[in-house]
Amino acid sequence: MVLYFIRHGETSWNVEGKMQGQTDIPLNENGIRLAQETAEGMKEIPFDLCITSPLSRARQTAEIVLGGRKVPIIEDARIEELSFGNWEGIGCRPENYAVPTPIEEFQKFYTEPFAFVPGEGGETILQLCKRTKEFWDEVTAKPEYEDKTILIATHGCALRAILHNIYEDKADFWHGFVPVSYTHLRAHE
């Protein structure tokens, strides 16, 4: 099994410094351009299947990368972005900070992610890791996927959570990627 993970392209809320979470924000013009550049770099990869977050920014990115190829696309909510609850849509950068908690507490999202407490109705990093681990375990255990090349379109935090489940250094949650980056893994017993 060969897995290619991609993070969605840029959205208007990325540019504005707003927390997106599970709010369905589509790609902006630059996000579409970034996805097209990624598609160019991945055009020779013979994908058998695509699994995507149901959020439009991830699905749009996947569809652009696939470029009209006849590849089945499956949506899976377990690879949606972390839910920030009632903080979604709120500015979270120092210049537009509007989160109803002291900025020092919010910064734990970056400095101590496992101690981060989201807004009401949101989920913790541990909850995100749990649902993405269920996804990982199911996909990598399916015998019908054993010889497949699979594109997985997801989100920055969700992708980090998936990878967190397989990294040796469990304390290091944040590994850097940029919008529409891709991560290539081979999964085997």
Locations of the language-model features?
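Loop-to-helix element that buttresses phosphate recognition and phosphoryl-transfer chemistry
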Residues: E10-T61, G121-K133
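Phosphate-coordination/substrate-recognition cap region in phosphate-metabolizing enzymes
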Residues: A39-F106
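Short, conserved phosphate/pyrophosphate- and ester-handling motifs at nucleotide-, phospho-/glycolipid
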Residues: H8, H155
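Short glycine/proline- and acidic residue-enriched helix-loop micro-motifs
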Residues: E105-Q127
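Extreme N-terminal starter segment of soluble prokaryotic enzymes
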Residues: M1-Y4
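Glycine-rich phosphate-binding loop signature in dinucleotide/nucleotide-binding domains
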Residues: E44-P46, V139-D147
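GST superfamily/GST-like fold recognition
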Residues: G156-R160
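Conserved small/polar residues in nucleotide/adenosyl-binding loops
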Residues: T183-E189
